[in-house]
Amino acid sequence: MDHSNREKDDRQRTTKTMAQRNTHCSRPSGTSTSSGVLMVGPNFRVGKKIGCGNFGELRLGKNLYTNEYVAIKLEPIKSRAPQLHLEYRFYKQLGSAGEGLPQVYYFGPCGKYNAMVLELLGPSLEDLFDLCDRTFTLKTVLMIAIQLLSRMEYVHSKNLIYRDVKPENFLIGRQGNKKEHVIHIIDFGLAKEYVDPETKKHIPYREHKSLTGTARYMSINTHLGKEQSRRDDLEALGHMFMYFLRGSLPWQGLKADTLKERYQKIGDTKRNTPIEALCENFPEEMATYLRYVRRLDFFEKPDYEYLRTLFTDLFERKGYTFDYAYDWVGRPIPTPVGSVHVDSGASAITRESHTHRDRPSQQQPLRNQTTSSERRGEWEIQPSRQTNTSYLTSHLAADRHGGSVQVVSSTNGELNVDDPTGAHSNAPITAHAEVEVVEEAKCCCFFKRKRKKTAQRHK
């Protein structure tokens, strides 16, 4: 009898020990550890919120096995216009061979949400544009342009069109990283296959399409309701290049009673602005670029090498060296805590996917162009550089630590007191109001800017 009881006690102790080991070593997706840490998959600890939008939110995360920071994009599983899985599929379609694409580490459920874990990158071109007093030199614009032509060529080679060109979607690498000089392309929530995967044929030309993209940069044909193709991505890039050189575009700041009227005015002004006037006082190559891409046929494959050569020849003729000495090099660049930039005043729109806050059919007050403080994400200070407090003071992270963050290696989910991923890591994920699905299950820009009051920053 005693022997039987001892065996029973031993089995109970063994079962309890195994359960404790399993609890420690194997965490289901989207569960919390005993210390209340929210996990995505077995590796990724969810940290503070660094962005949000109609379809979910962005969190800072950390890979507990490599000690590296990541970005975690969350979307409610029951979203009426889900796009995260489609974006993940596009990232996989693009693969990891192309330069200037963020690595995607994981996709899976996180409680009532789908989660995509991405490489954490540096600030966007819009942030850097602000840092450089909203004008880039010709050398910097040419180094950006040559790289982005290659990025877009690669995206197109994978049978995708991007459809959301804007400075907020192009990021440099993180400071101190070997890829810090590389311009990355992110956020494929509006991308579309322009080659039918079954027939292998180019999608047909159509008209009366809804606006998809960012009004400030989108092509003239997009304003006219024409189906987008490769030519439209390149025209939008050309508009962005001129934005960087000029500091603004002639169709910015137009007033109208409704958003629909405003988008109409933007399109009309683009059509009525001669390329020569848009590119006045800048090298002829800028006008040549825009003339070429605007003359492309809907089905035509652009000559990317011709366009790159246009800019590389100009670069060499000016005596520049491709040394990645951008205008922002040497300036106090804050260290970003998010790799997916939040929306600016030039918000992306799509009417073929859902009813959006910027949809022209909605009668709502127009937003004024956002200030630079609204455009920026949340930042940490990089103390190794001489900081300009007048620039940085109003742009610090809500959970700043007054200096570099010291991270202790951890694989057990325990939080170091100085770890930014520990801040509000188990805070509830707030789902935003659902939107009406109109046509395709795609979203427009994933993140909205959130203004943070000074008092909130110091909480």
Curated annotation (Swiss-Prot):
Q: Where in the cell is it found?
A: Cytoplasm
Q: Where is the active site?
A: 164 (proton acceptor)
**Does Cell inner membrane count among this protein's keywords?**
no
Question: Which segments show compositional bias classed as Polar residues?
Answer: 15-34, 361-372
Q: Summarize what the UniProt record says about post-translational modification.
A: Autophosphorylated.
User: Which GO terms fall under molecular function for this chain's record?
Assistant: ATP binding; protein serine kinase activity; protein serine/threonine kinase activity
Q: GO biological process: any one? A: Wnt signaling pathway
User: Basic and acidic residues bias located where?
Assistant: 1-13, 351-360
Give a short account of what the protein does. Answer: Serine/threonine-protein kinase. Casein kinases are operationally defined by their preferential utilization of acidic proteins such as caseins as substrates. It can phosphorylate a large number of proteins. Participates in Wnt signaling. Phosphorylates CLSPN. Regulates fast synaptic transmission mediated by glutamate.
Give the protein's recorded name.
Casein kinase I isoform gamma-1
